[in-house]
A protein has these predicted regions:
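Histidine-rich, glycine-flanked metal-binding segment
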Residues: 1-26, 41
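Activation segment
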Residues: 4, 36-38, 56
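Redox-cofactor binding/interface segments in oxidoreductases and associated redox assembly factors
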Residues: 17, 29, 57
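Short, small-residue-rich loop/turn micro-motifs
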Residues: 22, 124-128, 171
Length: 173
């Protein structure tokens, strides 16, 4: 593969007549749940095989950008993904072992060190943002304090500055 100034120049070896046809240089999948899979099989061959060249992770308020977020017996990645994705906890526990970062910057940086198939963009997931600031139990049982809201705003602004595409929610009240 080549990029930018490395692209070859000159006459094409083959010209395809495209009149009346569609040209899709690559598809963008804005709603994936590949957050765990991208670290276990970063080439994401089933995605690329279908013509998708860019995926977004961190959808539906779930993701791994804050790291494992484990505290005592609480395991937010396993608990949250089990409910939404219906993935067995035994499988999710193995996925959590692949998480080696503990902040949003290191999460984005780790993509530079794995052999990605498609391009990957990320959202800050709202549920995991709440867990990061409030802990799992409090994040699902009470409203945040003003100080907690301010910390969430700070982390979200930091994430946007780092290159996150925005914040995802699950759409529930």
């Amino acid at each position: 593969a080549a990029r930018g100034s490395e692209l070859p120049v000159g006459e094409a070896a083959r010209v395809i007549e495209g009149a009346g046809q569609w040209l899709l240089p690559g598809l963008l999948d804005i709603h994936t749940h590949l957050d765990l899979e991208v670290d276990l099989e970063p080439g994401l061959p089933e995605v690329v095989r279908h013509g998708t060249t860019t995926v977004l992770v961190g959808n539906c308020s779930l993701g791994t950008c804050f790291g494992r977020q484990q505290s005592g017996a609480q395991n937010p990645i396993v608990d949250c993904f089990t409910r939404v994705e219906n993935i067995p906890k035994s499988v999710l526990n193995q996925c959590v072992e692949a998480v080696h970062w503990d902040n949003t910057g290191d999460y984005l940086d780790h993509f530079d060190n794995i052999p990605l198939g498609p391009n990957v963009g990320a959202f800050i997931p709202h549920s995991m943002l709440r867990v990061e600031v409030m802990g799992l139990t409090d994040s699902i049982s009470r409203a945040p304090t003003e100080a907690e809201l301010a910390r969430m705003e700070q982390l979200l602004e930091q994430g946007i500055a780092q290159g996150y595409q925005g914040m995802s929610t699950d759409g529930l009240p």
